[in-house]
């Protein structure tokens, strides 16, 4: 399901990031960061009144060395391109500025709903000053104090009230995949090579309400795929295509919509921090993952090259031990024919269900190999386990005390489950729960 998108715009130092964090904090649960993985909080999911949406802090994308007005124009352009709803943040302390009027003129030309949030209204006496902002011509201003959380509920109500009313349910039989990675790792060439591999290509379809174009194709066995364009990778002339943070944001959006993610690494440049950040986001999101090393034709090789690369990848991406690695060349089409089959196989792993009886046989065998741990004389007791969901496969293990389930033993159980059932290319989640 594609979530509607809300973009926060405004000149520097009006509190965009504070409002972003305040809205993100309204979520019931926020996925924990994987240890050793950091990511810029410029894109997240939020929920209000049972409506979910994606939230973009455009200020996090700015090139700080760019001219002031260019930064603002950049933000507004992103919002107009990406968003279903725009939150325009201004400062109640400073009043209407030339920069605010400049942004308002740009936003006034869009047909997107714009919510005017007057931030830094930190006490009731300041509320009278918000009426000056009617001069921007963007409707009612909403007084907000992001720091204190005052007024954010009203802004969220306005956001939800302006979200698209219908969200199209996607066909569960279609496998959705995307190629992500740093700019210039060869994603576009890979996409074109994959789509040129004797596939039946359907007409491009609008992937969202914005400018992203998805491509459907069918393999020789009749399996349908949707390749999710990382919003503009196949188009020329995208103004911000090489802006790394912008690329991160668009990759995150593509990951959200994907079942399987192809993490593309440039063999000529090796692994960078960006690669680990994006891969960490895909892992946290529970997506199937394939590590694709492109431009393999350019590498001088000996008998140890593949093994050395694989060892380095496993060391750099320790949290992706389950992800297969494939070395390809979009230029020579080396091993490209393997990718659709790998995508299909990993999608099957994502959707695999294990019966409770078979699962518990594996758990009991695991306990026989490695008895449950003790803490202060009290031993962990596992009663039974059951699979509760797919995409990713998630298992609940019922125990006597949740605190006794050490991380290391949970990892041991995960390894035993993988050894028994495979689950290639997909994270699996194990949750310890006290039996009532």
From Swiss-Prot:
Coiled coil ranges (UniProt) are none
Quaternary structure and partners: Associates with the 50S ribosomal subunit.
Record-level GO BP terms:
ribosome biogenesis
Residue sites binding GTP 2 per the record: 181-188, 229-233, 294-297
Question: What family, per the record?
Answer: Belongs to the TRAFAC class TrmE-Era-EngA-EngB-Septin-like GTPase superfamily. EngA (Der) GTPase family.
Q: Which UniProt keywords apply?
A: GTP-binding, Nucleotide-binding, Repeat, Ribosome biogenesis
Quote the function comment for this protein. Answer: GTPase that plays an essential role in the late steps of ribosome biogenesis.
Output the superkingdom of the source species.
Bacteria
Residues involved in GTP 1 binding: 10-17, 57-61, 119-122
**Protein's name in the database:** GTPase Der
User: Upper taxonomic classification of the species?
Assistant: Bacteria, Bacillati, Bacillota, Bacilli, Lactobacillales
GO terms for MF: GTP binding; ribosome binding
User: Where does the EngA-type G domain lie?
Assistant: 4-167, 175-351
Q: Which residues form the KH-like domain?
A: 352-436
* HAMAP family attached to this UniProt entry: GTPase_Der
């Amino acid at each position: 399901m594609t979530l509607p998108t809300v973009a926060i715009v405004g000149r520097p130092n009006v509190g965009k990031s504070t409002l972003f964090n305040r809205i993100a904090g309204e979520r019931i649960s926020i996925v924990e960061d994987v240890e050793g993985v950091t990511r810029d909080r410029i894109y997240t999911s939020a929920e209000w009144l049972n409506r979910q949406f994606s939230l973009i802090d455009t200020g996090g994308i700015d090139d700080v060395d760019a001219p002031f007005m260019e930064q603002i124009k950049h933000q507004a352009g992103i919002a107009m391109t990406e968003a279903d709803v725009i939150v325009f943040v201004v400062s109640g302390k400073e009043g209407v500025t030339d920069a605010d009027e400049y942004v308002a003129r740009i936003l006034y030309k869009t047909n997107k709903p714009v919510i005017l949030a007057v931030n830094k209204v930190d006490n009731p006496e300041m509320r009278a000053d918000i009426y000056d902002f009617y001069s921007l011509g963007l409707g009612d201003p909403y007084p907000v104090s992001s720091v204190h959380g005052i007024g954010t509920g009203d802004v969220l109500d306005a956001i939800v009230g302006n979200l698209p009313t219908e969200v199209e349910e996607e066909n569960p039989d279609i496998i959705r995949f995307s190629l992500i990675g740093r700019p210039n790792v060869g994603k576009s060439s890979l996409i074109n090579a994959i789509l040129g591999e004797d596939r039946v290509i359907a007409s491009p379809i609008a992937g969202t309400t914005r400018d992203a174009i998805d491509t459907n194709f069918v393999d020789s066995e009749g399996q349908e795929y949707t390749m999710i364009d990382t919003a503009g990778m196949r188009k020329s002339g995208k103004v911000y295509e090489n802006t790394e943070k912008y690329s991160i944001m668009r990759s995150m959006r593509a990951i959200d919509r994907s079942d399987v993610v192809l993490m593309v690494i440039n063999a000529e440049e090796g692994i960078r921090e960006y690669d680990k950040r994006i891969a960490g986001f895909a892992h946290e999101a529970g997506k199937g993952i394939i590590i694709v090393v492109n431009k393999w034709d350019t590498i001088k090789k000996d008998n140890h090259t593949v093994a050395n690369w694989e060892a380095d990848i496993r060391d750099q991406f320790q949290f992706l031990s389950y992800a297969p690695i494939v070395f390809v060349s979009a230029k020579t089409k080396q091993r490209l024919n393997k990718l659709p089959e790998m995508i299909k196989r990993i999608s099957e792993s994502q959707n695999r269900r294990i019966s409770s009886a078979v699962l518990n046989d594996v758990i009991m065998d695991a306990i026989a190999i490695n008895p449950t741990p003790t803490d202060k004389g009290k031993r962990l007791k596992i009663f039974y386990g059951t699979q509760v969901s797919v995409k990713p496969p998630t298992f609940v293990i019922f125990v006597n005390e949740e605190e006794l389930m050490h991380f290391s033993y949970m990892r041991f159980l995960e390894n035993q489950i993988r050894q028994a059932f495979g689950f290639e290319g997909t994270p699996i989640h194990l949750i310890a729960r006290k039996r009532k």
